[in-house]
A protein has these predicted regions:
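A beta-strand edge to alpha-helix "cap/lid" segment located at domain peripheries
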Residues: 1-24, 34-121
Length: 121
């Protein structure tokens, strides 16, 4: 898996955001994945909880952009961590640190861990 292919996984996720459908986003996550979201204090542990988070997050009209990516691969596992910025429909923006951990399931790459936290400054 090349760095470009891992970067494309973020583009796929960001495109799913643009659909406005939380179910489409949740399908990119393993059923037992963990989401530590940007704009919520609640850790999400499954598709139902992940959909619930994105249902609220999508109401803001987010568009993501990676500012810095650090990609590493370990066989069936790939990690993309760095900084991204979400711009919202109302013109506001939030910069956050992120980590996506992907696992190859034999057919496609799935998100198994996603941690996103607003920059402290």
């Amino acid at each position: 898996m090349s760095e470009n292919e891992i970067t494309a996984l973020f583009d796929l996720w960001n495109s799913a955001l643009q659909t406005g459908d939380p179910k489409k986003i949740a399908l990119l996550y393993e059923t037992n994945s963990i989401l530590i979201p940007t704009m919520s204090n609640k850790v999400r542990h499954n598709h139902e909880e992940i959909e619930d988070y994105f249902d609220h997050f999508l109401a803001k009209g987010p568009v993501g952009r990676i500012d810095e990516a650090n990609i590493r691969t370990f066989g069936q596992i790939a990690i993309n961590s760095g900084i991204y910025t979400f711009t919202f429909r109302n013109g506001s923006a939030v910069q956050a640190r992120f980590t996506f951990v992907y696992r190859w399931n034999g057919e496609c790459w799935m998100i198994v861990e996603h941690h996103s936290s607003k920059m402290p400054e």
